[in-house]
A protein has these predicted regions:
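Transmembrane beta-strands of outer-membrane beta-barrel pores
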Residues: 41-47, 75, 96-102, 136-144, ...
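Repeated loop/turn-to-beta-strand initiation elements of outer-membrane beta-barrel proteins
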Residues: 47, 80-82, 172, 176-180, ...
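Surface-exposed strand-loop-strand hairpins of Gram-negative outer-membrane beta-barrel proteins
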Residues: 46-68, 106-107, 249-271
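Outer-membrane beta-barrel "beta-signal"
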Residues: 202-223, 387-407
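Residues that define the transmembrane beta-barrel architecture of outer-membrane proteins
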Residues: 33, 63-69, 107-113, 128, ...
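Outer-membrane beta-barrel translocator/channel fold
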Residues: 35, 40-59, 83-85, 130-164, ...
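Residues on the lipid-exposed face of transmembrane beta-strands in outer-membrane beta-barrel proteins
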Residues: 39, 69-75, 115-121, 134-138, ...
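Outer-envelope beta-barrel architecture signal
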Residues: 31-37, 86-92, 126-132, 176-180, ...
Length: 407
């Protein structure tokens, strides 16, 4: 199962890297973009969210800090273009990082591969702005829980984990070629409930870095008198259809304790979402969400054995398929940027049984493959607190009237 998990996570990351264009938009010259290479240092505080991090570990010391070094390549829309005005100087690229928690024996020193995107929140001058940035990818090189060799580690259950990061920072272009960035961010590591334990690790702290701009000109740093005309956005309704699948682990309550099932359970589902396109950057709508969750309503039962034998044998039992299907309705909102769309959803299952009843929340990243198709990477949370399942799939957009943006 471990090899299967590693294989699928690698496939997902490779798919993301493949879909990120080498030349940002077909038919456009590379001179329409500023190419950048950046380095960052990120000292972080580790939130004590589980006993292992609080000090119940081999050293009996809390794990409170981490440090990460990042190397990043990106391309950016040039200032004073249509794309720059619409998307706020958006940039996107790929990065690698190395993180240490000061305890290589129990946690390892994981390295991450990720895609990222950022843009302006506010501009104070042609050289100074407040920006945001998110990172998403995979981290490897962890020392996971092992019943014999690493039994204290209740935070990390797999050698590869998702890496999610978001932050804000001040960007100062202090010369034609160099930018200084100073800000803060939040990071989350977890395996998406694909393996136990999955307490995860959360950090927050500072980021400071230097960015080299290969082909930026002095004109790019000056205020232009010319403002390109932005085409009026045609408001319309588009329709997204997503098919997804994944696998998950499940904890089953036995009395007052939760017992981890040794099995991995399949998950498959669909979303059908009519979305009203308000403008270049926002969509809102609703979604019909169907799912088959092979772990739903799994239970553990005592089997009576003959007198004098060993203790009762306990098995994890699956109910009929009608107890593992659900149909829900959710409200959706999406933030649309070049190549990437970030979506959130909140809904409730209207046709469901047992532990599938209740509210659910969705966070999703859509990565453009063609004009009307995309990769879908999402996560489903139940009742704002219980990890549910990954949503890895492919989506198609119909009646798409989103205009092409010149830059």
């Amino acid at each position: 199962m471990r090899n299967k998990t590693l294989r699928w996570k690698t496939i997902v990351l490779c798919s993301i890297m493949f879909c990120l264009p080498k030349t940002p938009l077909a038919g456009q010259e590379s001179s329409g973009f500023i190419h950048r290479l950046g380095m960052e240092a990120r000292p972080q505080y580790v939130f004590p969210t589980n006993p292992f991090l609080q000090g119940e570990n081999e050293r009996w010391k809390p794990i409170q800090t981490s440090f990460a070094a990042h190397l990043k390549y990106s391309f950016k829309f040039r200032p004073n273009t249509c794309a720059d005005r619409i998307y706020g100087g958006a940039y996107q690229g790929i990065g690698v990082s190395l993180t240490t928690f000061g305890d290589k024996k129990q946690l390892g020193d994981p390295f991450s591969f990720y895609v990222f995107q950022g843009a302006r929140i506010a501009r104070f001058s042609p050289r100074v702005s407040l920006n945001y940035e998110w990172n998403f990818g995979l981290s490897a090189g962890w020392k996971p829980y092992d019943n014999y060799y690493n039994s204290y580690n209740g935070a990390v259950g797999s050698r590869m984990n998702a890496y999610i990061n978001a932050g804000v920072y001040i960007n100062w272009a202090f010369s034609r070629y160099f930018d200084l960035i100073v800000g803060g961010d939040f990071t989350h590591f977890s395996n998406g409930n694909t393996k136990f334990p999955n307490a995860g690790i959360n950090t927050a702290g500072a980021k400071i870095g230097l960015v080299y701009n290969f082909n930026r000109t002095e004109e790019d740093l000056s205020k232009s008198l010319y403002q390109p005309v932005i085409t009026r956005f045609p408001r319309h309704i588009s329709y997204d259809v997503v098919l997804f699948g994944s696998w998950r682990r499940k904890g089953v309550w036995v009395g007052e304790k939760q017992i981890a099932s040794p099995n991995a359970y399949p998950v498959a589902g669909f979303n059908f979402a009519p979305m009203y396109n308000l403008g270049y950057k926002f969509r809102v709508g609703a979604s019909l969400d169907g799912v088959y969750d092979g772990s739903a309503n799994v239970y553990r039962e005592d089997v009576i054995v003959e007198y004098g034998s060993s203790s009762s044998k306990r098995e994890f039992l699956k109910p009929g398929i009608q107890h593992q299907l659900a149909l829900g309705l959710s409200g959706r909102a999406e933030y649309v940027m070049p190549y990437f769309t970030i979506g959130v959803g909140m809904g409730a299952n209207v046709l469901s049984r047992g532990d599938m009843r209740g509210f659910y929340q969705i966070l999703a990243l859509k990565i453009a493959v063609t004009r009307s198709s995309f990769l879908h990477i999402g996560y489903n949370l139940q009742n704002f607190q219980t990890p549910n399942y990954l949503m890895l799939g492919l989506g198609f957009r119909f009646h798409n009237k989103y205009p092409k943006v010149r830059h």
